Amino acid sequence: MLKSAVYSILAASLVNAGTIPLGKLSDIDKIGTQTEIFPFLGGSGPYYSFPGDYGISRDLPESCEMKQVQMVGRHGERYPTVSKAKSIMTTWYKLSNYTGQFSGALSFLNDDYEFFIRDTKNLEMETTLANSVNVLNPYTGEMNAKRHARDFLAQYGYMVENQTSFAVFTSNSNRCHDTAQYFIDGLGDKFNISLQTISEAESAGANTLSAHHSCPAWDDDVNDDILKKYDTKYLSGIAKRLNKENKGLNLTSSDANTFFAWCAYEINARGYSDICNIFTKDELVRFSYGQDLETYYQTGPGYDVVRSVGANLFNASVKLLKESEVQDQKVWLSFTHDTDILNYLTTIGIIDDQNNLTAEHVPFMENTFHRSWYVPQGARVYTEKFQCSNDTYVRYVINDAVVPIETCSTGPGFSCEINDFYGYAEKRVAGTDFLKVCNVSSVSNSTELTFFWDWNTKHYNDTLLKQ
């Protein structure tokens, strides 16, 4: 029984509510034991390396010299958004007011369970050492960003050895900014780094890392007719199973769906989640594919607006590659959101856009897109430009794995020869028009992404947003 839970706290405004009382200390033996489910959490759970690495070495090919490195990263592990937290708290309230003794998969709730959202001020925010439920939690966004910085130095440190001053770019989302700052902290005090905070408001127009926010034509509910075809009866199965174990509980399919988010965000905040153990492996697979479907048709190749939106950043990336010999800065690091990265990868063509995902069943052999592989919390997409003898090449590294361009990968380390790459890039953006497709002029006069080139004179420092 969970008599300590107080509905007035849970139902209070998520902005103004106070701290939820603490329960017992987390069981440290469980922390770090659930990594096998990370790929099934739709990108809401902790960072993990891209599983489909094809066995290609991440190292720079022999006798080659790196010329430029670009990185577009997602913010690190975080607490749920306000809207998602409302759903989680609604389900938590139902559990906390259950008057019986919990049995079966929910029996852990009998033992003074401590709800992981202890303070609603943490909603939307990065998980840190300070706000984590357990100080031993290895999955905080803070620690992830600092580990990423150390990995960056190990892989590319020589690129910044003689470049002690350079810029790092972030959207003005608080959690993206925090990730960028923790990354900078992880680099140490050797560098003089200028953190440029770029607006993600629609008024930013094209001069943003978050182009979909500047797109009035963007439809959050696009392709719902396709998504509704997906069989979600497994959710009612979860609810029925738990209700059968606990008479009078009355969980619904909505509660069952909420448990997946609860599982992911609790791991981010605590280091493990007993809620995750209520699912069968089949249920995790079905949920994961549902997330793949939603992403593919609403922020990926299945939505025709996306390719134009992603072209805003991809065009800037290609321009930087072409200017690598004249630019003093050789490393370009940016932090933003998962949607922006998915748009970017869609335009690049890394995500297959030739075979639409089916909503009729869970495909296995035909499914090449897995949302969480590309955008777990703390995701990172590197663009490498390197020279071997007299030839220059480009390749992509996604979450620690080299992911070749399918039609252009005959160079060293399965890279793409530079002129072939530029030709490929032209084809990828042919027919795209971010400004026109999105009707950007209705919200902004900004028609070009310029912050990579004018940061030293404009000094971007937009007000941080709690989102």
From Swiss-Prot:
Short name of any one Pfam family annotated for the protein: His_Phos_2
GO molecular function, one term: acid phosphatase activity
Keywords noted in UniProt: Glycoprotein, Hydrolase, Signal
Keyword Glycoprotein: yes
Active site per UniProt: 75, 338
Enzyme Commission no: 3.1.3.2
Residues of this chain annotated as glycosylated in UniProt: 97, 162, 192, 250, 315, 356, 390, 439, 445, 461
Induction (record text): S.cerevisiae has 2 types of acid phosphatase: one is constitutive and the other is repressible by inorganic phosphate.
Protein name: Acid phosphatase PHO12
Originating organism: Saccharomyces cerevisiae (strain ATCC 204508 / S288c)
Gene name for this UniProt entry: PHO12
